[in-house]
Amino acid sequence: MSAIKIGKENFANEVLNSKKPVLLDFFAVWCGPCRMLGPIVSEIAKERNDVNVSKFHVDEQPKRAAWFQVMSIPVLALIKNGKLENRVVG
């Protein structure tokens, strides 16, 4: 399965209400490290069926990115039962 693009319309359903843990990739197209990480995130999405892998474009939803306290990118966040469990910056 490929990574799911998260937008305003599907955030609650795909992230907060997901039955599986969610690996959320906060990125921007202009971010060099994000572009390097992107293929790895896509590979994880293909290989793992126990976690939903999603991509979150920070420029499209800056308020929601701020809600997650994303100050720099890339950020990978693990969401379980609608709550932030862990995150890795950089």
Question: Which residues fall in each region the model found?
Answer:
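Thiol-based oxidoreductase modules, predominantly thioredoxin-like and allied folds used
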Residues: 4-8, 26, 37-63, 70
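Conserved beta-strand positions that form and line the central face of beta-propeller blades
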Residues: 5, 22, 87
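Substrate-binding pocket helix/loop in short-chain dehydrogenase/reductase
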Residues: 11
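Short active-site neighborhood of thiol/selenol oxidoreductases, capturing the structured segment around
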Residues: 17-27
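Short, proline-centered helix/strand-breaking motifs
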Residues: 21, 39, 74-76
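Short cysteine clusters
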Residues: 31-34
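Non-catalytic, surface beta->alpha helical segment in thiol-disulfide oxidoreductase systems
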Residues: 72-90
